[in-house]
Amino acid sequence: VSVPYHRMFRVDGRWRWWRPLAAIGVFLGFYLASQVLIAVAWFVPIGVQSGPEGLQRFQESLTSGALDPTDPVVLSMTIVSLVVLLPSIMAAVRIVKLGPFGQLSSVRTRIRWGWMARCLLPLLVLAVIMVGLQSWGTFTVDGSGVHWDTAVLGQSTVTLGTLTLTIVMVVLLVPFQAAAEEYVFRGFLMQTIGAWIPWRRVGAVVAVLVSTAVFAIGHVPNGYNVWGILDVGSFGLIAAVIVLRTGGLEATILQHALNNVTIFVLQAPGWSKVDIEASDGTWQGWLVTLGTSLLYWGLVELVAWRSGLDRRFPGEETPRFRGVAPAWAGGSRWVRPGGSGWSGAPARSEGVAGPVAAHVGASGPVEDAAGVAGRP
């Protein structure tokens, strides 16, 4: 008996259908509050230093659509505003008692660091291919060696200090931004949909489709055209499948972080002949994303097979009761085969439905009002 990743919310004894909805409310509250704090932290210093005109320019840069990696101030605020998705969803899951936050990480209720380390080999292959494809035609070779082709790219429009600051900031912050999006779209959202739908296979399909659609729609404000949205959607679709196939977010966090870091670093010099504000995707770009994502999935599957990865939670789902879960159950799992009892269940009192449990410690009998309602 085991539980797939998208049903992990069903493992905790306190599961109720309304808890994810309550968690969404808490999540939005924390996230919106954090956006206010971030706005104050960035806008106030800019207003003091540059005045109203500086604030207006900053606001225009933030709302221009495509993200400009050559402006460290705008880039830092944008990335941090996404990074806070992670503590917001952590707080929501904990406050609403959906179970341990680690269950969003994997079926082992934690980050599987050993498995993540094994995913570095497929990631390295992906990195070489992505950098090669995205920088194709931008290098030239002459007597002095290999260097950027300025005839194609133009000249860098940023100083060495700005370039260094941008790259350091991207390398340090973008992995957390990528992880935050994975926990929200491929973690919380997929587990919510999967827990609501009683049929596991149907739930898996719907969870993948819904998370992919929401992920793609979330990028519409960036000004992407149809090919750009298809590009993002293809990435999200295959990432969702990888999560279900591996039972965790580790592989997709690495893939997402690599994708974003590569894009930002290659654009950081601000080449004069490259329009970094252009957000229109192309069918060629979509095919590259689709092909590299499929390749990464295949390599991850191979590594998972060779390493004997545990893809499912080694336990059972909490049975569905007609009434309130027993007071002594708390968050304990239903652990005995066939749903014959709660772990750590105290002795049953007269008139309480269910099997007689052995006396546990000095807890005493359960009160009649807190007994287990009859199972369907």
Regions of interest found by a model, annotated:
Residues 166-324:
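Transmembrane helix-loop-helix hairpins at the membrane interface
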